[in-house]
Amino acid sequence: MALVLHTYKGNKSAEKALIAAEYVGVQIDVPSDFQMGVTNKTPAFLKMNPIGKVPVLETPEGSVFESNAIARYVSRLNGDNSLNGSSLIEYAQIEQWIDFSSLEIYASILRWFGPRMGFMPYSAPAEEGAISTLKRALDALNTHLTSNTYLVGHSITLADIITVCNLNLGFATVMTKKFTSEFPHVERYFWTVVNQPNFTKVLGDVKQTEAVPPIASKKAAQPAKPKEEPKKKEAPVAEAPKLAEEEEAPKPKAKNPLDLLPPSPMVLDDWKRLYSNTKSNFREVAIKGFWDMYDPEGYSLWFCDYKYNDENMVSFVTLNKVGGFLQRMDLARKYSFGKMLICGSEGPFKVKGLWLFRGPEIPKFIMDEVYDMELYEWTKVDISDEAQKERVSQMIEDAEPFEGEALLDAKCFK
């Protein structure tokens, strides 16, 4: 039985396995009669993937779903190749970049692109968060590629295949030349790799989008109404501009309310740089600098305490819980700074946090968008209380012990 990749035409997630197949020299058949929404709902398909997602690879030994898993399987079909590295450390680094490009790059591109296409609800703050996270990831990738042609070693590996396929979604949809020009080494890397023969066989002639797609509008899906009355020329002509105006109307609302607050003498990015760049004498330099900068009129400080600490019996589960919270806070990165302390040498671990937010209250869009907020008790800091002020300083500098307990970990959101 030949390998069969069940997917629809143009599925960018399926391209990873097809490119890997070119490198290892194996044949993969792609059925031409696959219909999304039909074929993937059949009993035969659901036996291969119970939730009906594509792509799915059918092999003589069984089926495999999830695009990265499929690409990994294909890359190992012929052992005489370098796609998985030549040593254990190279293999680990390949896996590292696969995870990085999937979790940091691809996920952020989807969160930017998806809402604009109507695949999920659009939120301006959420889009800002996605773009901010994507830029941070691309900046890290750009730094690595400053002195490296490929991600691992001196030839193309599976990490390059998956990363470039992930980048290709962004280049094709939302990442314009103006956007990617901030990351010249990423640009060089992307165009070098997509023009390799084994890539062009699958991807064809890759082009970069010239514009970010407009936000999908429900009203845009109703152009048939004017066409139903073609003889009444005056009505459609008069109504068409109104439709356009209605579609344009949401654009001013995209402005985040926090951007409309009176200017603050505290520049959040200046504080974040001071925090990151202070390597010694932290209390004398960074903490003193924070209080010199802090503007209680333009910003507010908040303590948070996890409500269900008795559940935090396993260290890595607790750390993952906090890490997930910080990931979901990405939409607020422009307007906030946070420290999360995981306290205790054994379970149950206590999770305590300190957050700096733009404005006098916790921004409403954060409360609405980040479900984790409800899992914490929030208390506004009274900086006139020297004990509370000292607690803020200790949390910023990861003082240990903190309130009589060792620190399992301290995470910074900046």
Swiss-Prot record:
Asked if the Swiss-Prot or TrEMBL record annotates the protein with the keyword Kinase, the reply is no
Which residue windows does the record flag with biased composition (Basic and acidic residues)? 225-236
List, alphabetically, the GO terms of the cellular component aspect.
cytosol; extracellular region; plasmodesma; vacuole
Q: Which residues are in the EF-1-gamma C-terminal domain?
A: 254-414
Q: Ranges of Low complexity compositional bias?
A: 214-224
**What is the superkingdom listed in this entry's lineage?**
Eukaryota
Kindly state which keywords UniProt assigns to this record, in alphabetical order: Elongation factor, Protein biosynthesis
Q: Give start and end of each GST C-terminal domain.
A: 87-215
Q: Which SMART domains match?
A: EF1G
What is the annotated quaternary arrangement, including any partners?
EF-1 is composed of four subunits: alpha, beta, delta, and gamma.
Any idea what job this protein has?
Probably plays a role in anchoring the complex to other cellular components.
Q: What is the protein name given in its UniProt record?
A: Probable elongation factor 1-gamma 1
Q: What is the organism of origin for this protein?
A: Arabidopsis thaliana (Mouse-ear cress)
